[in-house]
């Protein structure tokens, strides 16, 4: 939660109208003693006496000392008017955002027919937000009433809750925010702008979960796991490198600002590292959208998408670890080895705990959908799936973990296991539901970014810091991509080309996650400067890099129009035959374990556990195996169309055309006499809507006359060497 800002003071007195927002009022009889208000005073640090008419931010409490009845009636009338006015203003504010989303959708529809070469719809959504924010800030003014503002309260601290004594009655006010000294006469305007500024927790609890979940739920796992090692390197090592490079450069800028007298508040090295973690969260949603439309090379798409998905999770955990850095002693901003290792331990603990919680929630959902008959009631099934998925984020946050990591891995688990248990209608519903929520949330955030540039009231723009930040993010991205790509190419058969590296460098846009991390805490001078600079970075990268994506693809000669399923057809035969060797033994073991044990345990798919578990586990196997598994034993159903391709020597059929990858009869004896492990491996290869299952079952697919029948695999499989 954002820590409360201190109330601004002027000449030793507290200007209460700068820091207090009326949320509720409590009236007590005049005869009550101060001692009886002790518990209430524990949440309030001061009690102030006011004249008979007092107001904060448009709240007017008319107090008539002549009679209690008249005074009560006046208060009720004023309260009703205020409630009605507040309701109308809140409705108008929500209407603004609805109209922004509507305008964005119409613009996207227009772009479907006439594409703007150097402008993407996300950038245009930000422009719409900027225009609306400009109008709200400078075009609309609320008439001010000087009688509704009282400046006579004096306190010596900045309490979260304030009890105010007004003619013997006590009213409760809560801290809302700081108002700068030059805005004292615009209290009503400030309140209007504050109402269109959402609580930062809205982003984390409402808008981010569907975005992150959909990233995991729609993950193309075949290409993701092919490049998993590279993706993990970019996401973990790359983000850490970027964070420390940016933090070090920004610390130099801050030191320069101190020397030149440009720094008006405290800014420590830990703040610089926190800023590095915030802006290290890449969000190339604009670039990926263009990649998807142009069907860019699937390897590049997988690297960028996988990095951005895990990078967000790493960045938020890294920022939490930096905030938790607490060296021993009085100075909490010095370097301490013990505290550093403690922060590393916190990072590992939070990440692993969040991962476990997300996976566990997915497993629970698997069992609920497997052993109940919810599939007969599609509405209930979809509702349960939605609530269980969303609750993962809140559960992780409530337990002190990171909801972003938890909901990401929950989405991956739900897609791989729970999806197979859902009815066909619920499968379509869940995909469409989260796709819609992701679309609305992303566009809302980009529109809100533009709005915030004018409605946020505590911006701190420093030219030195801004210029240093832009230099730092470019150098940090370069230190992430190029050295790691060089090291990864040493162990990759399919090299990451220089054009791919340049494109990945170019595609390091900042977006929703960086904005959400920056706006979550703007209590201090340093945090306010971070937020303002992050906002400018997001604008620049989305407009310039997002708009220049098409031109950069052409300049770097990167393939477009590539079918992700048939991309392997252009690969030479010798490279295709080495695909099996490229697959890491760890993932081959995982696939075997997943197919034979996890999928039968969690879903209706896969072989029954009674055939894979030892005989001594028979009762448990029969209990955990669903009846559908026995029905599907001869024709295993796997809706996951994105598994790793391990073999390139099997004839596959796409629609009405057959692809000849290798002679099955010539290669089968050689392949199946290798090791007993490979003999027992059950291969499930899926391309598009056509599934090929090899498990000793005779399969007949449309073949050309020149091709050997696919069922010859069954014969050669059991033929002697």
UniProtKB/Swiss-Prot annotation:
The lineage of its organism: Eukaryota, Metazoa, Chordata, Craniata, Vertebrata. It comes from Rattus norvegicus. The chain crosses the membrane at residues 91-111, 123-143, 196-216, 231-251, 272-292, 298-318, 344-364, 388-412, 434-454, 456-476, 499-519, 535-555. It is a multi-pass membrane protein. Keywords: Antiport, Cell membrane, Endosome, Glycoprotein, Ion transport, Isopeptide bond, Membrane, Sodium, Sodium transport, Transmembrane, Transmembrane helix, Transport, Ubl conjugation. One of its GO terms (molecular function) is identical protein binding. Belongs to the monovalent cation:proton antiporter 1 (CPA1) transporter (TC 2.A.36) family. This is Sodium/hydrogen exchanger 6. Pfam families: Na_H_Exchanger. Ubiquitinated (in vitro). Glycosylated. GO terms for biological process: axon extension; brain-derived neurotrophic factor receptor signaling pathway; dendrite extension; dendritic spine development; establishment of cell polarity; glial cell activation; neuron projection morphogenesis; potassium ion transmembrane transport. Endosomal Na(+), K(+)/H(+) antiporter. Mediates the electroneutral exchange of endosomal luminal H(+) for a cytosolic Na(+) or K(+). By facilitating proton efflux, SLC9A6 counteracts the acidity generated by vacuolar (V)-ATPase, thereby limiting luminal acidification. Responsible for alkalizing and maintaining the endosomal pH, and consequently in, e.g., endosome maturation and trafficking of recycling endosomal cargo. Plays a critical role during neurodevelopment by regulating synaptic development and plasticity. It catalyses: Na(+)(in) + H(+)(out) = Na(+)(out) + H(+)(in); K(+)(in) + H(+)(out) = K(+)(out) + H(+)(in). Residues 1-44 are annotated as: Disordered. PANTHER family: SODIUM/HYDROGEN EXCHANGER, SODIUM_HYDROGEN EXCHANGER 6. Disruption phenotype: Mutant mice generated by CRISPR-Cas9-mediated gene editing display an early neurodegeneration of the cerebellum and a more protracted timewise degeneration of structures within the cerebrum. In both the cerebellum and cerebrum, lysosome deficiency is an early pathogenic event, preceding autophagic dysfunction. In aged rat SLC9A6-null brain show deposition of amyloid-beta and tau. GO terms for cellular component: axon terminus; axonal spine; cytoplasmic vesicle; dendrite; early endosome; early endosome membrane; endoplasmic reticulum membrane; endosome. It is found in: Endosome membrane; Recycling endosome membrane; Early endosome membrane; Late endosome membrane. Residues 26-37 have a biased composition (Basic and acidic residues). Homodimer. Interacts with RACK1; regulates the distribution of SLC9A6 between endosomes and the plasma membrane.
């Amino acid at each position: 939660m954002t820590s409360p800002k201190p109330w601004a003071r002027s000449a030793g007195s507290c200007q209460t109208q700068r820091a207090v927002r009326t949320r509720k009022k409590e009236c007590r009889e005049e005869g009550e003693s101060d001692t009886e208000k002790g518990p209430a005073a524990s949440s309030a640090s001061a009690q102030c006496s006011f004249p008979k008419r007092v107001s904060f931010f448009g709240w007017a409490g008319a107090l008539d000392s002549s009679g209690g009845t008249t005074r009560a009636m006046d208060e009720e009338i004023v309260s009703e008017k205020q409630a009605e006015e507040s309701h109308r203003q809140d409705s108008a504010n929500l209407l603004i955002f609805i109209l922004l989303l509507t305008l964005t959708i119409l613009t996207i529809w227009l772009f479907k027919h006439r594409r703007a070469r150097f402008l993407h719809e996300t950038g245009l959504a930000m422009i719409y937000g900027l225009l609306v924010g400009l109008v709200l800030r400078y075009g609309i003014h609320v008439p001010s009433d000087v009688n509704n503002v009282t400046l006579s309260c004096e306190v010596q601290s900045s309490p979260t809750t304030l009890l105010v004594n007004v003619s013997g009655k006590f009213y409760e006010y809560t801290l809302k925010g700081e108002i700068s000294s030059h805005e004292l006469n615009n209290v009503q305007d400030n309140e209007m702008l504050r109402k269109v500024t959402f609580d930062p927790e809205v982003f984390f609890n409402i808008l981010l979960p569907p975005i992150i979940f959909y990233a995991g739920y729609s993950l193309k796992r075949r290409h993701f796991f092919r490049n998993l090692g590279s993706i993990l390197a970019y996401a973990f090592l790359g983000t850490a490198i970027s964070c420390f490079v940016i933090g070090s450069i920004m610390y130099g800028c801050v030191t320069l600002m101190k020397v030149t007298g440009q720094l008006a508040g405290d800014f420590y090295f830990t703040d610089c590292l926190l800023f590095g973690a915030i802006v290290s969260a890449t969000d190339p949603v604009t670039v990926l959208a263009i990649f998807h439309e142009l069907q860019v090379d699937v390897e590049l798409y997988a690297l960028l998408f996988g990095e951005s998905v895990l990078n967000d999770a790493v960045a938020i955990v890294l920022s939490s670890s930096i905030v938790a850095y607490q060296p021993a002693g009085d100075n909490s901003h010095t370097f301490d080895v013990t505290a550093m290792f403690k922060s590393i331990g916190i990072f590992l603990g939070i990440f692993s705990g969040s991962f476990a919680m997300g996976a566990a929630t997915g497993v629970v959902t698997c069992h609920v959908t497997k052993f109940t008959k919810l599939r007969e009631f599609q509405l209930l099934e979809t509702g349960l799936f939605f609530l269980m998925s969303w609750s993962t984020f809140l559960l992780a946050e409530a337990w002190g973990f990171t909801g972003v990591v938890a909901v990401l891995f929950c989405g991956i688990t739900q897609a791989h296991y729970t999806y197979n248990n859902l009815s066909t209608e619920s499968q379509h519903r869940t995909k469409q539901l989260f796709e819609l929520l992701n679309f609305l949330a992303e566009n809302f955030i980009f529109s809100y970014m533009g709005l915030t540039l004018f409605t946020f009231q505590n911006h701190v723009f420093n030219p030195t810091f801004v210029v240093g930040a832009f230099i730092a993010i470019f150098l940090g991205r370069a230190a992430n991509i190029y050295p790691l790509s060089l090291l990864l190419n040493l162990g990759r058969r399919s090299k990451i080309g220089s054009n791919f590296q340049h494109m990945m460098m170019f595609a390091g846009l900042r977006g929703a996650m960086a904005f959400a991390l920056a706006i979550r805490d703007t209590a201090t001078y340093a945090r306010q400067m971070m937020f303002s600079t992050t906002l400018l970075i997001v604008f620049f990268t989305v407009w310039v890099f997002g708009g220049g994506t098409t031109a950069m693809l052409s300049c770097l000669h990167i393939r477009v129009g590539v079918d992700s399923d048939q991309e392997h057809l252009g690969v030479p035969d010798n490279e295709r035959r080495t695909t099996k060797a490229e697959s890491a033994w760890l993932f081959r073991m995982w696939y075997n374990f997943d197919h034979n044990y996890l999928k039968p345990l969690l879903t209706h798919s896969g072989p029954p556990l009674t055939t894979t578990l030892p005989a001594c586990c028979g009762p448990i196997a029969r209990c955990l195996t669903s009846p559908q598994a026995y029905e599907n034993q001869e024709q295993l159903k796997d809706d996951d169309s994105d598994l790793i391709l391990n073999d390139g020597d099997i004839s596959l059929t796409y629609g009405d055309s057959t692809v000849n990858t290798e002679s099955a009869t010539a290669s089968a004896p050689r392949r199946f006499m290798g090791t007993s492990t490979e003999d027992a491996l059950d291969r499930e290869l899926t391309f598009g809507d056509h599934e090929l299952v090899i498990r000793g079952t005779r399969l007949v697919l449309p073949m050309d006359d020149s091709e050997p029948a696919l069922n010859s695999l069954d014969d050669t499989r059991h033929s002697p060497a």
